[in-house]
Amino acid sequence: MRSIMEVETLKRLALMGANKEQVSLSSSIFATSLGMSPQTAARRLSALEEDGYITRVVTPEGQKVRITEKGITCLKSEYRDYCSIFEDGGAPVMRGKVVTGLGEGQYYISLDGYRNQFNDKLGFDPYPGTLNVRLTEPFIPAEHEAVVIAGFKGENRTFGGCKCYPVRIKGVRAAIIRPDRTSYPPNLIEIIAPIKLRESLGLRDGDEVEVTLE
């Protein structure tokens, strides 16, 4: 999301029910609810549509708007941020099920260019492999929470950077690792730890787990 005003516009649409269904929108009434001119409101809607946060259908009577999955994900991220500010309920907990990964983690985590940074920045030497968890909700962290792992050049290729997010799983210190370039959906996470989590925690595919953000 590019600006606070666009977030506010998206929130206003959700309060009108656009997160659940397509709603008819009067430009003048909508602009008044946001405290801005119809022209400015139209630009906000256009920006949201261009960025993929809403869909719009223009009719002779006005327009019909619905928030996309991307827009809902954005609102959920905002919600979690406000919960962390105002609620005194402890660290955020994510829930999901263990799944089989692609098997590429062992190779990449073993590379010294990554491994040395994991040691320095996360404080542990990771087991060469990842635990993959499919969450019930997308994992959309705030940028300031990330531990940045820089990319580097090998003998024959360049390796991209990634971001890590310290967590605990069943009391074990670990970290979610998310490459800067990934084909994984937002609700699928890879976890590294100083031990083989599957073996040490007795986990199998389909087992439900809780992942606590540090």
Curated annotation (Swiss-Prot):
Alphabetical UniProt keywords: Flavoprotein, FMN, Kinase, Magnesium, Metal-binding, Nucleotide-binding, Transferase
SUPFAM superfamilies, per the entry: Riboflavin kinase-like, Winged helix' DNA-binding domain
Pfam family, one: CTP-dep_RFKase
Family: Belongs to the archaeal riboflavin kinase family.
A GO BP annotation: FMN biosynthetic process
Protein name from the UniProt record: Riboflavin kinase
Co-factor binding details: Binds 1 Mg(2+) ion per subunit.
GO molecular function, one term: riboflavin kinase activity
Record's function text: Catalyzes the CTP-dependent phosphorylation of riboflavin (vitamin B2) to form flavin mononucleotide (FMN).
Cofactor annotation: Mg(2+)
Superkingdom: Archaea
Organism encoding this protein: Methanocella arvoryzae (strain DSM 22066 / NBRC 105507 / MRE50)
Pathway(s) where this gene product acts: Cofactor biosynthesis; FMN biosynthesis; FMN from riboflavin (CTP route): step 1/1
Binding site for Mg(2+): T130, N132
Region spans: Riboflavin kinase: 92-214
EC number: 2.7.1.161
Binding site for FMN: T182, E190
